């Protein structure tokens, strides 16, 4: 749905330090839209109050995301599209988005720290940390950037299709979302390989 990479490099040229990268993703569960990953390099001694994005209010997430973008040495936000999700499956599409995020960084990388239990296929030392978004600040920063970016996608979708309520459910398969989907049918961006969407498609084929 979007450019698969958005990145910013704030590191002065000529500095050859290798950096620790934090990576996280958002959007594996929704029925619609991209899966989004972010990779972040923070400066040493960064004093941002970071925590798991899911534990922050939307307004607080947006504020901290702006601060991260201002203070990060480098960051990249990357996506895998609904078509890629349907083609690859959600796990492999998520790994692809993470790989794109890491590859979008423009600084030397020493190690990659990923939230979860699996690392993407990147040519660096990589450690997966279960619940890392609540334990490791640089992963928390990636979680916040990814969450804010995906929520912004859902707001754009809400403005185009307000009858679906994307501003409320963010694309997740809530009761409200399933009711709206049954009522209004599919629009571009739905993940056709996901069971609730498949069910709607099968019902439409019978009409």
From Swiss-Prot:
InterPro entries given in the database record: RNase_HII (IPR022898), RNase_HII/HIII (IPR001352), RNase_HII/HIII_dom (IPR024567), RNaseH-like_sf (IPR012337), RNaseH_sf (IPR036397)
Superkingdom per UniProt: Bacteria
Cofactor note: Manganese or magnesium. Binds 1 divalent metal ion per monomer in the absence of substrate. May bind a second metal ion after substrate binding.
Matching Gene3D superfamilies: Ribonuclease H-like superfamily/Ribonuclease H
Residues binding a divalent metal cation: 24-25, 115
Location relative to the cell: Cytoplasm
MF (Gene Ontology): manganese ion binding; RNA binding; RNA-DNA hybrid ribonuclease activity
Every RNase H type-2 domain range: 18-206
Keyword terms of this UniProt record: Cytoplasm, Endonuclease, Hydrolase, Manganese, Metal-binding, Nuclease
CDD domains in the record: RNase_HII_bacteria_HII_like
PROSITE patterns assigned to the protein according to its UniProt record, in alphabetical order: RNASE_H_2 (PS51975)
Enzyme Commission no: 3.1.26.4
Names of required cofactors: Mn(2+); Mg(2+)
GO terms for biological process, alphabetical: DNA replication, removal of RNA primer; mismatch repair
Keyword ATP-binding: no
CC annotations in GO: cytoplasm; ribonuclease H2 complex
Pfam families: RNase_HII
Catalytic activity: Endonucleolytic cleavage to 5'-phosphomonoester
Family classification: Belongs to the RNase HII family.
HAMAP family in alphabetical order: RNase_HII_B
NCBIfam families cross-referenced by the UniProt entry: PRK00015.1-3, PRK00015.1-4
Function, in words: Endonuclease that specifically degrades the RNA of RNA-DNA hybrids.
Descriptive protein name: Ribonuclease HII
């Amino acid at each position: 749905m979007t450019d698969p990479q958005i990145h910013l490099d704030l590191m002065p040229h000529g500095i050859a330090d290798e950096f620790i990268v934090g990576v996280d993703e958002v959007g594996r569960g929704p029925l619609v839209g991209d899966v989004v990953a972010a990779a972040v390099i923070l400066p040493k001694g960064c004093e941002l109050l970071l925590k798991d994005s899911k534990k922050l209010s939307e307004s607080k997430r947006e504020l901290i995301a702006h601060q991260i973008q201002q203070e990060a040495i480098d960051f990249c936000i990357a996506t895998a599209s609904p078509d890629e999700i349907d083609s690859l499956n959600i796990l492999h599409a998520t790994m692809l988005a993470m790989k794109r995020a890491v590859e979008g960084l423009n600084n030397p990388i020493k190690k990659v720290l990923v939230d979860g239990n699996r690392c993407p296929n990147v040519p660096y030392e990589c450690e997966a940390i279960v619940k890392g978004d609540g334990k490791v600040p640089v992963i928390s920063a990636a979680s916040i950037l990814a969450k804010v970016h995906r929520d912004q996608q859902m707001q754009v979708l809400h403005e185009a299709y307000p009858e679906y309520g994307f501003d409320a459910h963010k694309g997740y398969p809530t009761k409200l979302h399933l009711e709206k989907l049954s009522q209004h049918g599919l629009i571009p961006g739905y993940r056709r390989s996901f069971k609730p969407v498949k069910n709607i498609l099968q019902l439409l084929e019978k009409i």
